[in-house]
Amino acid sequence: MPTRKLIAEVVAATLARTRSYFEEEFAIGVADVSQDRGDIDMLDIHDLTAIVGVGGPVNLLVAFSFEQRLVDTLFQRMTADIDVPAGEEDVYRSAAAAEIVNTIIGNCTSDFQQQDRGIALTPPVILNKAKHLQRMKNAVFVSRTLNTEFGCVDINLVGPTELFDDSLNYVK
């Protein structure tokens, strides 16, 4: 499968898997998906962001940036049956976000797995209270926002510019 087609599949799989995971595991419906992509220098991010590297036929960074209210709701639902020690809420909240992203991206691998090539994933890296991600040289941000009643999550892919045309569409 060409690399450019694989990127389009990564985007589609990530959106579909995020939507289904939110609905099935947390009973949180995704109202709509908005699109924002481009050759911007700085990406504004929300209160908690989890970044995973996807390697193999295509190398991308995938950053899930959660609004505080949404990550709080996810955290509460994930830890409902756990005694969270006082003062450890932020640690557990970050761990919950990392687990959510890890599960979503892990589930995505079956959607774009090639028989002859493996797919490598990095563990999630958590950014708390960061405000921006600086664009790397020769990279493009492709962003989608999933809106829920509890806030939104931005899903940002960071990939090399040669995979996109001058209008920042995937080159197939």
Over which residues does each language-model region extend?
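N-terminal auxiliary interaction/assembly segments of multi-subunit proteins
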Residues: 1-172
